[in-house]
From Swiss-Prot:
It comes from the Bacteria. Pfam families: PilZ, PilZN. This is Flagellar brake protein YcgR. The N-terminal domain is involved in FliG binding, the C-terminal domain is involved in FliM binding. The PilZ domain is able to bind c-di-GMP, but with a lower affinity (dissociation constant of 1.45 uM) compared to the whole protein (dissociation constant of 0.84 uM). Changing Q223P: Significant suppression of the pdeH disruption motility phenotype, no binding to FliM. Acts as a flagellar brake, regulating swimming and swarming in a bis-(3'-5') cyclic diguanylic acid (c-di-GMP)-dependent manner. When bound to c-di-GMP it binds to elements of the flagellar motor (MotA and/or FliG and FliM, binding to FliM also occurs in the absence of c-di-GMP), causing the motor to slow down. Thus, increasing levels of c-di-GMP lead to decreased motility. Probably binds 1 c-di-GMP dimer per subunit. GO terms for molecular function: cyclic-di-GMP binding. InterPro entries: PilZ_domain, Split_barrel_FMN-bd, T3SS_YcgR, T3SS_YcgR_PilZN. Its main location: other. Keywords: Bacterial flagellum, c-di-GMP, Nucleotide-binding. Belongs to the YcgR family. Changing I227W: Some suppression of the pdeH disruption motility phenotype, no binding to FliM.
Length: 244
């Protein structure tokens, strides 16, 4: 997660505690990962100087994590991904049941997801995508916008009759120029229309596709994050030049 943009790093103690309290209140599952293992837990209690975590379901994992150092804790909420590291866990009790305790982290990553960050793809050069339909024909389209959770695309031809919302596609090829070629499993969430007025004051209607990415690996997610912020920076620089 250190590869994410620094704006996602929470360093204020009150902000860190606020995120942790939200995880506790919503009973969000936590994944504890260390060198050689992982387990699923949840926050049982939180104070400014103590975190109480539930024991995992497997005794051998609980024993192993107590011996581990530099434990990474991650959580997935509807709007964000949370990740932080603690140096070590100690065994304790909570409500007369075994539990882990540790001190709250000084910082944590709070990476906001799809509905918060969506960046338009550049018009020049355009980024093109392609995938296969059920009849083995090739469907080509242009990347319109991009987020960690999915992408929007524009068809340059009429919508094929067999293209329906809810369809899943394996390994859609997305050519993002200087960033390289990526392949995503994705589900078609919606089909709509993009309408613009051209220079002749005529309405141009283009089929618009919205995809949700499936099974994106952490490595690819980090690459997407870097691309999104680079595109955002380039767009901001162009806007500044126009204003100047």
């Amino acid at each position: 997660m250190s590869h994410y943009h620094e704006q996602f790093l929470k360093q204020n103690p009150l902000a860190v505690l606020g995120v942790l309290r939200d995880l506790h209140k919503a009973a969000i599952p936590l994944r504890l990962s260390w060198n050689g293992g992982q387990l699923i837990s949840k926050l049982l209690a939180i104070t400014p100087d103590k975190l109480v975590l539930d024991f995992g379901s497997q005794a051998e994992d609980n024993i192993a994590v107590l011996k581990a150092q530099h434990i990474t804790i991650t959580a997935e909420t509807q709007g964000a991904k949370v990740e932080f590291t603690v140096e070590q866990l100690q065994q304790s009790e909570y409500l007369q049941l075994p539990a882990f305790i540790t001190v709250p982290p000084p910082t944590l990553w709070f990476v906001q997801r799809r509905r918060y960050f969506r960046i338009s793809a550049p018009l020049h050069p355009p980024y093109f995508c392609q995938t296969k339909l059920a009849d083995n024909s090739t469907l080509r389209f242009r990347l319109y916008d991009l987020s960690l959770g999915g992408m929007g695309a524009l068809l340059e031809t009429a919508k094929p009759a067999e293209l329906q919302e809810g369809m899943r596609f394996a390994q859609i090829e997305v050519n993002m120029g200087q960033w390289g070629v990526f392949h995503f499993d994705a589900q078609l969430i919606s089909i709509s229309e993009r309408k613009v007025i051209d220079g002749k004051n005529e309405t141009i209607t283009t089929p618009r596709l919205s995809f949700r990415f499936l099974n994106v690996s952490p490595t690819v997610e980090r690459q997407l994050q870097r691309i999104i912020f680079s595109l955002e920076r380039e767009a901001r620089e162009k806007a500044d030049k126009v204003r100047d």
